[in-house]
Amino acid sequence: MFMLPLGLMAQTVKGKVTDSSGEGLPFMNVIVKGTSNGTTTDDKGEFSITVKKLPVNLVISSIGFKTRVINVSNSSYLTITIQDGNESLEEIVVIGSRNPNRTAIDSPVPIDIVDVKELTAMAPQVNLNQILNFVAPSFTSNTQTISDGTDHIDPASLRGLGPDQVLVLINGKRRHTSSLINVNGTFGRGSVGTDLNSIPSSAIKRLEVLRDGAAAQYGSDAIAGVINIVLNESVNELSLVVTSGAHFSKNSNSQTGGVDGETTNISASYGLPIGENGGFINFSGDFDVREDYNRMKEWEGGIFNGYNAVERFANAANYDTTQFLSLANGLDPASTDYNTILNDLKGFANAAGYNTTASDGLSELQTILNVDATTSELAARGLERTDFNMRVGQSKVRGSRLFANFKLPLDNNGTEIYSFAGLSSRAGNSAGFYRLPSQSRTFTPAYINGFLPEINSTISDQSLAVGIKGKIGDWNVDFSNAYGKNAFDYMIGNTYNASQGVASPTVFDAGGFSFTQNTTNLDLNRFFENTFEGLGVAFGAEHRLENYQIISGEEASYTQYQADGTPFTGIAGTSPLKDFYGRSRPGGSQVFPGFGPQNELDRSRSSVAAYVDLDATFSETFSTTLATRYENYSDFGSTLNFKLASIYKASDNFRIRASFNTGFRAPSLHQLNFNSTSTIFEDGVPVEVGTFANDSKAAKLLGIPQLKEETSNSFSAGFTAKLPESNISITLDGYMVNIDDRVVYTGQFKGPGTGSELDRLLVQANASAASFFANAIDTQSKGVDLVITHKANLGENARLKSDLAATFSKTEQVGGIKASDVLEAAGLVDTYFPETSRIFLEESVPRTKVNLTNSLTTGKFNIFLRNVYFGEVSEATNTVANQQTFATKIVTDLSLGYKAAENLTLTVGANNLLDVFPDRAIEANRSGGRFDWSRRSQQFGVGGRFLFARVSFNLK
C-alpha cells in the first residue's frame, strides 16, 4: 500500500564548504531543509548527499559560522562559502520530538549531539562506553574488576541513575538489553544494562543523548533519558583506522612500572550506492585485542599453614597425601589403615618441625598444625608473595563487530525500505580471588600452591531491524520490526571443584543465559503547517516480546559432593567432603559455580503500547510538546504516562525551556527470574550466596514482597543562550527525578542454622546465604547540567573549537526502607537494604563531572586537549568507619594529528597524560594488599597513563 508512482529520479549533490579564505571547513552540517536527511563535511570540507528530487534547499550550519540556505537546482559541483558568525549548532535531531524540523537548540528538553567520527579521529577512546564517559559528563561507565560477568560488560549510567533506567535506540528503534544481570560488588548492582560495546564506533554517524525522562514517548526504561545511535550512511568512501596503544604507568605490572594492557583496534567502513534513487548499504566493523593489566602489588596475608608444610615433606617422599584427607572424611578410627596413616602424618609433621610426640589423635594434630607457616614455606618452596597475586584490573578481550545499514527508496515521495543489522562476538578472560593453599576451597593434591581461577566468557550479540515507510495521503507511515538477542556463556578455567577431590576436572562448562527481544512498531505522523504556527501530530502502537533463558552447565560445575563421590543433599547424617581440618569443601567450580537444572528456565512476556505525541508551535516564540503513552505488560499490568514540555523564545539569542513527565520501568525478566549461586567476597571473606527468584519459597519465608514496576516523575527547567559578540552558545538545565519502589539487590540473609526450611533451601542451592531483588526504597535525583560551546577562527588557517560541559548531581534515598512486617519483626531491615547498597546508589559514581575540550586545527595539524574533572566517590561497605571518600581528580587527554597525505592522517596521543590515579584505599579496605584502589567505587579506572598511535586512511 506504500507504493506510489515514481517521480523524478533522486540526485546526488556534491560540493565543498569553505571559509572566506577558501580553506575547506570540516564537520559542517549539510541538511535538506525540512527533513532529517543530512551529512557532515569531511576533513577537506567536502560533502556528498543524496536528495529525492531537485530543486532542493540545503541548510549549511555550524557553531561560529553564519547559517546559509542554498537553493540547488542541478547536480553541478557546489562551492559554498560560509562567513564567520554567531549562529549556534542547529542539528536536526531524531529523539525528544517527532517534529521533523526540530533542532537541538529549539528542543524543549536537553539533547547532546556527539560527533563520533570527529572524536574517533582524535580522542584516545575507541569503544562507545569510553567515548561517552569522557565526552558527556552526565554519562558514567568504567571497566570493573573481580566482579564475575561484570568484568566483561561495563555498566553505564546517565545522571547517576541505574544502567536499566537508560533506554538505547538505534536509528530511533529500541535496542535490546544485555543478558547479564549485575549481582557482584559494583555500581549498577541488581540491574541490567545495554551492551554498548557490541556496536562498533565506525558504524556510528552521531549520538543523540536526551537528558530527560521519556517513558511517555518511548516506553519502559527511559526514566533517566535516551541514547539514540544514528548509523553511518556514507557511500563510495573507504575508511580504515588502526589504533594501537598500551598503559605506560608507574603502577603498571603490579606497581613495578613499565608497559601493560596492550590494545589494538582495527576498524573499517565502506558504503555502496544502490540503484539510481539514492539507495545505499553501508558496512562497518572492527576487530580488537585487549590484554589485561594488574594493579595488585603484593598479597600481605597468610598463605600456608602447618598442614601445607607436612604436605611438602610428604610429596618429597612421593607419599599420596590424599590419604591424610581420608582421616577427616569417614575412615574408621578403629581400622588399621587409620592408625597407619595417622602415624605417617605424625612422622612428616615431626620432619617439618612440629612436635607431635604427645598427640594421641587427629583433633590434637589439627590443633598443632593450625598455625601460620607462610614465611618458612615461601622460603622452602622458592616462592614470593607476588606469586599469589590476583589480576586486579581490566580483563582480556578478543572481539569483532559488524554492522550494516541499508536504505532503498522506492519512489520520490518518501517510500523506502530500510534495514540495519549487527553481529558481534567477544571472548573475555578475567580472574577471581586467588585460592590459597591454606583454604578449604583449594584441593592441594591437585594445586600444591593454590591457583588463580579464570572466568572465560563468550558474549554474542545479533540484531536485525527491517521497516518500510512512506505516505498514505498526507500522513507519514513507518512500519518496522526489530529483533535482538544477547547471549553470555561461561567457561571456567584453571579451577577445581574442591568437594570432588581427585576426580575434579580443571575446566568447567558453567552454562550461561540469553535474552531475546522482538519489537514491532507502527508509527504515523503529520505536520500541519496551517494549524497555529505549525502542529506535529504523531501516534502509533508497539508490540514487544521478550524471552529470558538460563542454561545449565555440567554437573561438576554446580554440585557439592560427599566423600564417596555422590552429590551432597543435606539429608541428616550426610556431609560434604572435608579438608584436613574438618571444614566442608564448597562445591561447584571455584570462582563461578555453574548453573544447575534447578536454575534452568525459559521465561517470556509480552507488552503492547499505544501513544499520542503532539508538538505545537503556537507562535514564533512559543511551542509545546504533549505526549501520552499507555502500556500493558502480560506479567504485571498496565501503566499510563504523560509528558509536557515547552520552550519560549525570549529573543533571537535566548530561549527558556521546561518539562514535566511521569515514567515507569517494568522489572526486567532477569530481575523477576534470575537465580544462581555465586561466590561473593565480603571484606575479603568468600561467601557462597544464592540468588533466589522473587516468588521463590525462600522469598516467602523471609517476607520479601513481590516485585512491581518502578514509577517516576521528573521536572526539568533551563535555558539556551547565544552570545553573538563572542561566538558562544550556552545551555543550562536543572532537573529533579523522583523514583518510587526502586528495584535493588538485597543484602545476604543467612539461615538460622537450626535445620529450618530456609536452611534446607540454602543447602539445596549449595549456598550459605540468600539474596533477592526487591522494591526496597524510593530515591530522588537532582542536579544541574551546563554546556558552553565556543568556536573561533585564529588567523587565516587556524580554527579553535572549545566545549565546556559539566554536571552536578545528587541521588539519595527518600524516606525509610520498605520492609515487610516479617523483616521488621526479625530485625532484618538493614540486611534488606544494607549500607553497601545505599552507597552503590548514592555515592559510587562521581556526583560532579566537568569536561573541557579544545580542538585546534591549523594547516595539516590538529591538536586535541581535554581535561575531565571527576568528583568524589565513596567506598561501598557496610562498615561505616571504613566508608572512605576518594578525592576529586583531573584526567588530561592530549593528541596531535598530522595529515601526511591526501588520504592519510597520523595521530599520536595519550589518555591520562599525567598518570593520575584515584586516592589509595585505607588499610581497612585493602583486603590484605589485594586492592590498593577501590574496586567497588570507580571514578575513572586504575589503568593510569595510556599512550596510543593511530593511522587513518580515507579513500574516495
Regions found by a protein language model. Name each.
Residues 18-23, 28-33, 57-65, 73-121:
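Short, acidic, small-residue-rich periplasmic hinge/interaction motif at the N-terminus
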Residues 47-50, 173-211:
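Short acidic/polar hinge/loop motifs at secondary-structure boundaries
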Residues 48-50, 129-179:
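Extracytoplasmic beta-strand/coil segments of soluble accessory domains associated
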Residues 76-83, 128-131, 156, 194-197, ...:
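N-terminal periplasmic accessory domains that precede
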Residues 178, 739, 810-813, 868-876, ...:
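C-terminal beta-signal and adjacent terminal beta-strands/loops
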Residues 232-249, 254, 365, 371-379, ...:
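Surface-exposed extracellular loop regions of Gram-negative outer-membrane beta-barrel proteins
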Residues 447, 451-466, 470-471, 483, ...:
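Outer-membrane beta-barrel transmembrane domain signature of Gram-negative proteins
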Residues 539, 734-877:
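Gram-negative outer-membrane beta-barrel transporters
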